[in-house]
């Protein structure tokens, strides 16, 4: 079967899946979030490349934000004021890596509707860029350290030691903290918090964690964690979505499911909902077509999908839903602003 045939089948199955009548609870959730802004996410286009797409939070009004068949686009993030957009642009032949995506290709800055896109630096430069709260700077992460860069000029303003941080850096909404994945604290793949002024670090959660992001209050984080001791998946277990206070004093399950790894947790701007992806494959499977996304109310958590006998024994009070099923994608980002939909999807190659 050719790649085009596979993609055609994929789009048909996705469409058929969305056409299934949802339960009344899921239908109410969909109606509740339908008008709450837009979600940007990367996904395979019908041409086989990765483009950026927009959709309403209920999955409706899906449209292309970029149409660049000679490139792949990944890792989009709206600025906190929703006026700007950052993403990585890769060569069409380069597979998106679930672990290296923040340092692949070149960084692109654009208006939130995709217009006036401009390449910042060369390939591999400005890795793991994350917007400052005011959109005037972004923080980057490399072997040289955590650097704070002027968003207009590209000038490095200051640099802090990276303290074991190595990927998935995100600046807090209040500007005081950074969260990221660190090989520190006596183990690997920890979630850690860094003081953005002093560079001091502390662990939020340790061992087999990834894809951290902030709640709007900057006091809590959402992240993926594979708790040790699981017997399923041949003893390897499954990655689950958790939340914790940023000081690392408490944590709780948000969503999990035996049979799918849950990644890319992103909390809505009002702190009431969370987006995520669920994939049988590790890292959300960006090498192929990503994975189905989901949306739930945080107040409904914890939720456990499917039979998941082992998980339900550990979390007897967990619910089974509702979870709104969304199209396949990867690393989504949500804004309540209407700005992203102001332009039609005619984005062309970014300028240098």
Question: What is each model feature region?
Answer:
Residues 20-352:
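Sequence signature of WD/YWTD-type beta-propeller architectures
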Residues 1-2, 59:
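Accessible peptide chain termini
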Residues 2-9:
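Sec-dependent signal peptide recognition
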